[in-house]
Amino acid sequence: MENNIDLNVYFCFVNRPCTGGDFVNLDHVRTLRKLGINASILLAGNQSEEIVNSFGSLPVVILNEEIEFSSQDIFIVPEVMQVLYDLASKMTVFPRMIMHNQNPFYTGYGFLSAQHINEHRLERIIVPSSYTKYKLQEIGVTKPIDIIHPYIPDYFKPAEKQREVIQIAFSRRKRSAEFDIFKFYFLSLYSHKHSVNFVNIQGLTREEVAKVMSEAAIFISFAERESLGLMTLEAMASGCHVIGFSGYTDIYNNEVIDDSVGDWIGEGEYTLFAQKVCQAIDDFVNGKMNPKIENGLRLIEQRFRIRHFEQEVKRVYGNIFDYDLENSRS
């Protein structure tokens, strides 16, 4: 059954999708379109044919001076996109504007302060975790906040782990220098009894990342200032033993990461980091049962698959549209 609700929802971009947050926004667009909602990409930056084509089959609307919006149109805008917040504030006909804040620590790129957010004609905020909601409210944001957790695609799943050469997956995008520090400590402490291959997933497509993780025994995390930690969840879904930085500034207030699903190290604990990876290699080679891996897999299946995401999309956007999406079929 299609709903065919008579409104337009625009997800704002300034370039090709390339980050985890970008891909989450595209998941929102696809799911809303499955529900019969006219959701599109609003491209406000680089508008070359190559960039337009990077969104695949999703409809792209080019933002220019000729396009007109109604007061019922809805803009979904990332927290960092100051140009869109400023532009919308100056429009004669002001669309409904909703922030999709996927990282509270980058909110300063879009707004000067929490007070600036509260005073803006922004209607409400969507976030990917209760941690993000907590961090925004902690600093004084009073706008209504809804949570839609992203999902981990089913192609993130365990495969046969390579044993002749033990694969260790990582991304150095956020902590490039610290990977080099870690590797020095690791090579200084490792027994070198088993061959090890470090595989950098930075720059790979999401499907390529899934393949690397599925074959990797260990994922070493160089997360920093996370709102949820999507890459860590992908590694859990792939059956990796996750070791490293959680990415949370105050880990005790997050809803996902604890010692039952991985081994987490504090800032500067490079010796401990290397020791934990060395131990994990020995445990893997010896076939030791690892409850952290099983707990991580269980966490993903219970909370972060597409069925959970679609339920939250229906609930949150149904409230925004004032329409019962939860009892509709996609």
Swiss-Prot record:
It holds the Pfam family Glyco_trans_1_4. Keywords: Cytoplasm, Glycosyltransferase, Transferase. Its EC number is 2.4.1.-. It comes from Actinobacillus pleuropneumoniae serotype 7 (strain AP76). One of its GO terms (molecular function) is UDP-glucosyltransferase activity. Belongs to the glycosyltransferase group 1 family. Does not require a metal cofactor. Catalyzes the transfer of a glucose moiety from UDP-glucose to another glucose that is N-linked to an asparagine within a peptide or protein. Can act in a repetitive manner, and this way it elongates the N-linked glucose by a glycan chain consisting of several alpha-1->6 linked glucose residues. Is able to add up to six glucose units in vitro. Cannot use UDP-Gal, UDP-GlcNAc or UDP-GalNAc as a substrate donor. The keyword ATP-binding does not apply. This is Alpha-1,6-glucosyltransferase. The lineage of its organism: Bacteria, Pseudomonadati, Pseudomonadota, Gammaproteobacteria, Pasteurellales. GO terms for biological process: protein N-linked glycosylation via asparagine. GO terms for cellular component: cytoplasm. It is found in: Cytoplasm. SUPFAM superfamilies: UDP-Glycosyltransferase/glycogen phosphorylase (SSF53756). Pathway: Protein modification; protein glycosylation. It comes from the Bacteria. Its main location: cytoplasm.
